[in-house]
C-alpha cells in the first residue's frame, strides 16, 4: 500500500509540475535560435499588429495567443500562460531592465528571424489621408540622423527603468524651435509601450502632461513628437488612447496624428497617411528565464 501511495504521489507531483505553467509544459526557450525552433511553444503578440501577422504567417507548430496590450503580454508571460511574446528589440531592452527574470532571443529580420520590410518593422507618424502635414514632418524627420536616433533610443531605455528620476544628461534630440502660432498639434499614443511611450507621475526628463489624464507621457515617441512640434513652431498636446482606437481617432479628426510605435503596414496605409520611418528595429521574442 505504501508503494502504491508513493507511486500515486510521484505521479501527482509530476502532473503538478507539468501544469504549473498555465496548465501546460513549459517550453525551453534557450534552445531557440531561429523561427523553426519555436515549434511546440506558445507565443503571443499584440492584437492588430504586424507582430501578430508575422507570427501567424511565418511560424509552424506554434500555439499563438493575442493580447490587447503589452501589459497583458507581460502578465501572461510572468504567470506562465505563454512561453514568450514578440516585440521590437528596444522594447526588450526596456522590459528586461525592469524584469531581470526575463531575457530575449536576438532574432534578426530576414536572417534567422521574421521576414519583414522596413515598412513592416519601422515606425512612422500617421495622419489623416491627404494631410498637408506629411511632407512638412518628413522634412523635420530628415534632420535627425541615424546616430542621433540610436542615441536617443539608448537614453529613453535607461529613462524607462526609473521614469520619475532625472537622467542627469542632456537628451540626444533637442530643438531650438519656438512656438510661432496658436496651432496645437494633437498627438495620440498608448502611453503604455516602453520605451516608445509610457506614463509617469512627474515631468522628469522632458515628459509631457497627458491632455486627457492626470499623468505625464514620456518615451521615444514623446521626444519625437516634441521635436516635430518645436520644429514646426506649434504647440503640442499628448493624448493617451487605446491601440485599437488610434486610427479611428485620427480618421474622425479627434487627433491630428499618431506617434505610437506604429508600423506603416499596407492595411494601415489604406486608412491613414504615413511619414517616413523615424526608427527601425528587429523583431525579437521576450521569454522568462
What are these model-derived regions, one by one?
Residues 16-20:
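C-terminal motif of bacterial Sec signal peptides marking the signal peptidase cleavage site
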Residues 37, 42-47, 51, 57-58, ...:
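Extracytoplasmic small-molecule ligand-binding "clamshell" domains
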Residues 1-8:
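Positively charged n-region of N-terminal signal peptides that target proteins for export
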Residues 25-30, 39-41, 48, 53-124:
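Ordered, small/hydrophobic-rich secondary-structure cores
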Residues 26-35, 156-185:
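Bacterial Sec-exported substrate-binding components of ABC uptake systems
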Residues 23-38, 94-120, 127, 226, ...:
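Acidic, polar ligand-binding/catalytic clefts
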Residues 11-15:
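Alpha-helical transmembrane segments
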Residues 22-23, 47-52, 116-166, 222-231, ...:
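Extended ligand-binding regions for polar small-molecule ligands
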Amino acid at each position: 500500500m505504501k508503494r502504491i501511495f508513493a507511486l500515486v504521489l510521484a505521479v501527482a507531483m509530476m502532473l503538478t509540475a507539468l501544469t504549473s505553467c498555465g496548465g501546460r509544459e513549459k517550453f525551453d526557450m534557450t534552445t531557440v535560435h531561429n523561427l523553426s525552433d519555436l515549434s511546440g511553444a506558445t507565443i503571443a503578440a499584440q492584437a492588430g499588429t504586424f507582430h501578430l501577422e508575422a507570427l501567424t504567417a511565418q511560424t509552424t507548430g506554434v500555439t499563438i495567443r493575442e493580447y490587447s496590450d503589452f501589459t497583458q503580454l507581460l502578465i501572461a508571460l510572468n504567470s506562465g500562460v505563454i512561453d514568450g511574446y514578440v516585440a521590437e528589440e528596444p522594447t526588450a531592452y526596456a522590459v528586461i531592465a525592469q524584469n531581470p527574470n526575463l531575457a530575449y532571443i536576438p532574432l534578426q529580420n530576414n536572417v534567422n528571424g521574421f521576414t519583414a520590410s522596413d515598412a513592416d518593422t519601422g515606425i512612422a507618424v500617421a495622419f489623416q489621408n491627404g494631410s498637408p502635414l506629411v511632407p512638412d514632418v518628413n522634412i523635420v524627420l530628415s534632420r535627425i540622423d541615424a546616430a542621433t536616433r540610436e542615441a536617443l533610443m539608448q537614453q529613453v531605455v535607461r529613462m524607462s527603468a526609473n521614469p520619475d528620476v532625472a537622467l542627469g544628461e542632456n537628451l540626444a534630440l533637442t530643438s531650438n524651435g519656438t512656438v510661432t502660432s496658436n496651432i496645437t498639434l494633437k498627438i495620440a499614443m498608448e502611453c503604455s509601450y516602453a520605451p516608445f511611450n509610457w506614463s509617469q507621475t512627474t515631468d522628469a526628463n522632458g515628459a509631457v502632461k497627458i491632455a486627457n489624464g492626470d499623468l505625464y507621457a514620456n518615451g521615444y515617441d514623446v521626444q519625437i513628437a516634441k521635436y516635430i512640434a518645436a520644429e514646426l513652431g506649434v504647440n503640442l498636446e499628448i493624448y493617451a488612447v487605446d491601440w485599437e482606437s488610434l486610427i479611428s481617432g485620427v480618421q474622425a479628426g479627434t487627433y491630428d496624428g499618431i506617434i505610437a510605435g506604429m508600423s506603416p503596414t499596407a492595411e494601415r496605409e489604406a486608412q491613414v497617411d504615413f511619414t517616413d520611418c523615424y526608427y527601425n528595429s528587429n523583431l525579437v521574442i521576450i521569454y522568462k528565464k
